[in-house]
Amino acid sequence: MKKFLAFVLAVLTVVIMPLEISALETVEKENEFVTLPEKVNELTPLRTRKKVEGLRMYVDEENPLFIIRNCPIYTGDLSAQTFASAAIKTYFALPQDVRNFAVIYIDEGTTYMTPQEQLDFWDELLYLTDEAGVPIVCQSECFCTNKQRDPFTEEQLSGIFERHTSFMGFVQVELSTNGVTNEKLAYDEVTEDNGVNKNILARLKSCIRACKSNGGLFIWQDMEYIYWKKANYVNFILQDKELYNLLKSCTENVIIMDKHNGHGRHFASQSNIMGCWLDDVCGNWGVNLENFLWYEEGFKEYDDIGVAPNEPDFAYTSKYPPALYGIDMIADLVGGATVYAIEGTFGRGGLYYWVNGEVVMTATFNDVLYPFYQLVIGGAVPDKEQVKEKIKVAYKMTSPATYALSGNDAHILQGLYCDSFNFFHENFDVRSNPYNDCTKTWVPSTGRYFIVPILPIHSKPKEVLPDSYVLNDFTYFIRLLFIEPIKQIFFNQKYKKTYEGDGVLFDINDYIYIFNSNENKTINSNQTVKYTLPESGIELRTNFVAHTYAIFDESEDKISIDLCNLRLDTDDVCAGRENEDQFMASFAAGGKMSDPQNFRQSVIELSGFEAEPVVRAEGSNGAKLRKEWNEATKTLTVTTISNGEVRITIE
C-alpha cells in the first residue's frame, strides 16, 4: 500500500505539479556538533479525497480525515457569522495538502442552546460555509445534553444535510460521562425528567439514521472511566442489538474515536474501539488528542505523581508536551487509525492563535501535527489485513463487567503494555491517594504485544480474526487462571520478541516507529532500542529520553528519519505570572521553546554499512547534530541536541 502510494505521489510530483523540494544540507564535520539549517515545511504532492457515490465524505487508509476545530473565540461577538468566519479562516490557514483531507469541527452551543436555537445557529453558519466551500461537522450531543435539552428529531437532523452542501456530518462526544444502566440499555423507551429526554440510545439511533439516509458522517468520540458503569463504554452500549446492527448497516458512514481524556482505562478504550473497527461496526476509527488529559490524570509538574483527577489548575495542561501528541498518534496509527483530531486549552491544545485577525499555526502544528499528517497522506496507515496479521491474541466480550475487562485498566492488558495496579489502587477510594480513580499512564510500555483488541458482544470472532487466538471469559479463566505470570507466558508464546530494549518499537507497513514511553518522568528517563532494519540488515540502536519519538523509513538505499521531542517553557504560565493569551501570543511568535532544559540529547547508532554514508539534516529551533564514523566497526553514530523536529537522511 505504502509503495503504491509513493509511486503515485512521485508521478504526481513530476507530471501534475513540479514542486521544488529543498534538499537537506549535508553534514560535513565529524565529531563535533553543528547547528542545522532551519527546516522548511514543503507541500507534499497534492491529491484530493476519493469520491464515492452516496457518501458526502469517503474515509479510508488512503483518504484519511483530519478534524480541526476552529481557532477559538471566547469573547466579543459570538454570533454564527463570527464562528463561520473563524471556521473559514482556520480552514484556509491549513497547508493545502492537509486541507484537502480536513474538515472543520463546530462544537459551539451544545452546552447552552435549546434544540431550535442550535438548529438556527447551524443554518446561519452553514449558509456561509456553503458559499466558501469549507467542509463542516457539527457536535449534536455531548456530556450534558441528554440532561439539559430535548433531543433532535431525525427529520430535524436530516434537514441540516438537505439544506447545506458543506455539511459533512454530526459528532457525539463523551456520552460515557453519563454512565449506563442495564434497565435502560435494551430499549428505546423515552424517559423524561422535567421535559428532558434522557435516553442516550434513542439519540444515538436517530442521529445515525439521519447520517445514513443523507450520506453523512456519524462521528462518535468517547473514553472510559474506572467506575464500572463507565468502563468498556462503547462495547457496553453495543449490547443493544438494534444499535449494533444499525451501525454495521452503514459502516462507511461511521467513525468511532478514542477520546484521550477521562480517568484511566486509556488502553481498554483503545482496544474496545479498535475491536469495533475490526468487526465493521465502524468503517474507520481514530483518536482525539487533548491536553485536558494532563488535568484529568491529576498531573502538575514533571517528575511529580501529582494529585487526584481534575484537581490541578487548568494552567498545568500547558505541561502536556506537544511531542506526546505525536507519540499518541503513532500508538493508534499502527492499529489502522485513519481519523485524527485535537482539542484542549491554550489554543485547542496549543495548535494556533489569532494574530491581527488571522490564524497563525504554532510549532505544535508545524513540528508535530503537520509532518505526521503528511506521513498519513503519503500512505503510512496500514490497511485492515495488515493490522490483522499483527494480532495474535484478541478478546471477545461476553460481559462488560467481567474480571478480564474490569479494573483501573482492563486486567487482560495489565502487565503487558499497560501498567499493573494493586488491590489497594483498584478497590479503595482515598482522596489523598493520587492514584484515586486514575492510572497516570496512557503510552504503551512496549510494542511487543501490538494492540490487543476487544471484540463486541455480538461479533463473530472466527469471521473477524480467523488467524488469531480469541480469548473469552471462559478460556481466560481456564488458560490463564487469572494469574499474571501465566498470562505473561501465554502472551510471550504468541508474540515473539522482535527487538531488544526498554523503549517502544512498532514495525508495520514499511515504517518503523520508536518512542520513549514516559508520560511524566523526565529524570533518568532514557530508554533504548536495538533492532535490525528489515530491508538493509543494518543494526539500529537508539537512546531516547522522555517525550521523544522517531519515524524511520528505508527506501532506495536511503534511511530517512524524522525525530521530534518538542516541549514548551511553561513555568511562567503555571506560576500565574502570565495568562493563556500572553502564553499563546508568545508561542505563536516563536517563543516558549528556548529553555535549555528542554534541549535534550537523542542518539541513533547504525552498524553494518560497507562504507561511510552521507548524512544530510535540517531541524527546527536551533537543533544541533554530531556525526561520528567508526571505520573499524562500520558504525555511524548520530547525536542530536534539539527541542523540536529534526529530519535526517542517511545514504
Regions found by a protein language model. Give the residues of each.
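Positively charged n-region of N-terminal signal peptides that target proteins for export
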Residues: M1-F4
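Mature N-terminal, pre-catalytic/accessory segment of carbohydrate-active enzymes
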Residues: T13, P18-P135, G159, I551-E554, ...
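Conserved, function-critical positions that sit in or immediately flank catalytic
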Residues: V8
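Short, hydrophobic/proline-enriched secondary-structure or compact coil segments at domain edges
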Residues: S22, V393-T398, I559-N565
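Glycan-processing catalytic domains of CAZymes
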Residues: E30-G503
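C-terminal beta-sandwich/jelly-roll accessory domains of carbohydrate-active enzymes
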Residues: I412-E651
